[in-house]
C-alpha cells in the first residue's frame, strides 16, 4: 500500500490482459486508463474492446483496476437507496454527510489509509504491471481522468512509452472542480448562441439565455415532481445550485444537450420533470464509480490548489461539495513535478470535442505545446466529451498507433469528423388530433391526420432528434 514501506500492508491489483487475435502480435501492449477518477478499467472492458477493436487485433489490451477502483483495494461508498438518490442530488448537506460516513467506513479497511491512492503511486503500479508482462514499451490510451494518468506515466517513465493517445485531456495542473465550472459555463453559453443562430431553435426558444437567467433568479422554489428513478411523487426544493448542477451532465453529449432548450423552457414554467429525467438518464451509476478513490485523488491533487472562492463562472455546487468533503479527507503527498508536462520523446495524439463542458480543446492545446513537436492536437468541433466514440476517429487512432515511424504517426489524417453537425434542438411531437369516424371505404377510422385518405392534412411534427 505504502511504496515507502514494502514490508507493510499489501494490496492486490486486478489486471485483465485481453490477448491479441493475430498469431504474430506486436510486442507493445496497449494500456487503457479509465476516467473518473474512480472508474474501473476492467469494468469498462466491453467499452475498451469496442473503442480499440482494431488495435486489439495485433496488440494485447491491458486493463488495470487502478488502486482504489474495481477489485484493486476498492474504496466503494454505499449506493443510496432509489428513494434517497434524488434528495442527495439536490441537497449538498446530505451528500457531504454521506461522504463523511463513507470516509469513516473506508478508513477501517485493511487498505484504508487514503493517502496512498494518488495518480503518481497508481502509475508506479502500472509500470510494475508492464515489467511483470516483460514489455519493454507500451502504448497508452487514456480517456478523461485517464489522460491525467497517461500524462503522469509519460512524465515518470518516458522511455517506456511508444505512443500515447489521450482523449478529453485533463492535465495535472487543471484544478477540479473550479475548471469544470468555467468550462461548463462556456459550453452552456455556446448552446445558447447556437440555438439563437438556428432558425428552428430560435423560434421555439426565443431569448433562451434570458429564460435561463430568469429561471435561476426564481429559485429556490418548492415543487412537487415525479422521482425520475422511482416514479413516485416527491416534494423537493429546487435551488439555483441544484439546477446548475443538473444541466452539467447532459452537456457532455450533444445528443443529450439537444434536449436542454426544451428542458430549460419547461423548468422556467415550473415543470422540472424533464430536466430531472434528463439528468438522471445519463452518466455513471453510483455503483460504477469508486467515490473513495475519487475523493482520495481530487482531495490530494486538486483541492489544495482550489481558489478560496468561486470565480466569475460561479459554482454549480461541486466546489462547495469538494471543499466540505476534502476538509476532513486524508491527503497524500504529491510531488511538485506531477504538475509539470515535460517534452515527450514519444508521439502523443490529443483528442478534444469542441462542445466538451469539462475537458474542452483549450486544455489539450496547452498540453500539446508543452509536450513539444511530437504532439498533435485534433479537435472535433461538434463533439462533446470523448472523441473515440466516433468510428472514424477510432480508425485514426488505430493508424496512429500502428504507424511504422513517428513521422507517419503524426501525419495521420484525423479530419474525418470535421463536418459532423451539431444535433438540432429537440422539439416535442405535436399532440395527436382526434379523427371523426367516416364511412369512406378508402380510409380507416384511426388514420392519422395527413395520412392517405384523411380529409384534412396537418403539419407534420418536427423531427424529435
Where do the model's predicted regions map?
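Alpha-helical scaffold segments in soluble metabolic enzymes
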Residues: 128, 246, 262
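A short structural micro-motif
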Residues: 214-218, 253, 266-270, 281-285, ...
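Structural motif
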Residues: 227-245, 252-256, 284-292
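Structural alpha-beta junctions
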Residues: 269-272, 373-375
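Short helix-capping/linker segments at secondary-structure and domain boundaries
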Residues: 251-265, 269, 304-309, 405
Amino acid at each position: 500500500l505504502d511504496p515507502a514501506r514494502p514490508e507493510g500492508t499489501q494490496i492486490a491489483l486486478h489486471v485483465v490482459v485481453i490477448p491479441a487475435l493475430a498469431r504474430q502480435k506486436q510486442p507493445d501492449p496497449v494500456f487503457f486508463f479509465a476516467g473518473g477518477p474512480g472508474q474501473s478499467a476492467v469494468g469498462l472492458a466491453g467499452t475498451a474492446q469496442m473503442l480499440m477493436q482494431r488495435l486489439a487485433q495485433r496488440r494485447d489490451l491491458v486493463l488495470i483496476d487502478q488502486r482504489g477502483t474495481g477489485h484493486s483495494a476498492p474504496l466503494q461508498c454505499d449506493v443510496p437507496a432509489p428513494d434517497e438518490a434524488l434528495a442527495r442530488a439536490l441537497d449538498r448537506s446530505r451528500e457531504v454527510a454521506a461522504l463523511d460516513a463513507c470516509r469513516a467506513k473506508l478508513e477501517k479497511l485493511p487498505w484504508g489509509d487514503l493517502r496512498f491512492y494518488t495518480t503518481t503511486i497508481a502509475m508506479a503500479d502500472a509500470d510494475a504491471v508492464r515489467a511483470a508482462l516483460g514489455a519493454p514499451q507500451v502504448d497508452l490510451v487514456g480517456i478523461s481522468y485517464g489522460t491525467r494518468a497517461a500524462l503522469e506515466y509519460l512524465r515518470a517513465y518516458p522511455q517506456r512509452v511508444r505512443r500515447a493517445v489521450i482523449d478529453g485531456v485533463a492535465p495535472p495542473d487543471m484544478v477540479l472542480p473550479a475548471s469544470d465550472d468555467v468550462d461548463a459555463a462556456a459550453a452552456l453559453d455556446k448552446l445558447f448562441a447556437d440555438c439563437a443562430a438556428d432558425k428552428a431553435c430560435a423560434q421555439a426558444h426565443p431569448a433562451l439565455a434570458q429564460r435561463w437567467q430568469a429561471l435561476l433568479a426564481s429559485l429556490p422554489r418548492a415543487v412537487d415532481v415525479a422521482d425520475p428513478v422511482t416514479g413516485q411523487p416527491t416534494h423537493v426544493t429546487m435551488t439555483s445550485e441544484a439546477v446548475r448542477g443538473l444541466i452539467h451532465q447532459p452537456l457532455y453529449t450533444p445528443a443529450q444537450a439537444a434536449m436542454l432548450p426544451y428542458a430549460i423552457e419547461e423548468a422556467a414554467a415550473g415543470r422540472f420533470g424533464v430536466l430531472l429525467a434528463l439528468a438522471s438518464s445519463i452518466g455513471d451509476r453510483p455503483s460504477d464509480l469508486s467515490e473513495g478513490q475519487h475523493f482520495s485523488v481530487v482531495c490530494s491533487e486538486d483541492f489544495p490548489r482550489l481558489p478560496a472562492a468561486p470565480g466569475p463562472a460561479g459554482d454549480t455546487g461541486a466546489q462547495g461539495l469538494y471543499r466540505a468533503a476534502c476538509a476532513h479527507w486524508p491527503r497524500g503527498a504529491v510531488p511538485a513535478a506531477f504538475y509539470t508536462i515535460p517534452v515527450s520523446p514519444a508521439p502523443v495524439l490529443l483528442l478534444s470535442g469542441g462542445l466538451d463542458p469539462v475537458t474542452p480543446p483549450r486544455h489539450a492545446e496547452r498540453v500539446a505545446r508543452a509536450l513539444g513537436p511530437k504532439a498533435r492536437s485534433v479537435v472535433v468541433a461538434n463533439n462533446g466529451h470523448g472523441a473515440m466514440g466516433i468510428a472514424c476517429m477510432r480508425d485514426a487512432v488505430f493508424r496512429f498507433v500502428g504507424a511504422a515511424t513517428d513521422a507517419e504517426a503524426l501525419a495521420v489524417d484525423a479530419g474525418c469528423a470535421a463536418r459532423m453537425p451539431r444535433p438540432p434542438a429537440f422539439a416535442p411531437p405535436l399532440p395527436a388530433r382526434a379523427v371523426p369516424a367516416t364511412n369512406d371505404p378508402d380510409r380507416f377510422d384511426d388514420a392519422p391526420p395527413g395520412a392517405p385518405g384523411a380529409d384534412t392534412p396537418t403539419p407534420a411534427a418536427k423531427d424529435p432528434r
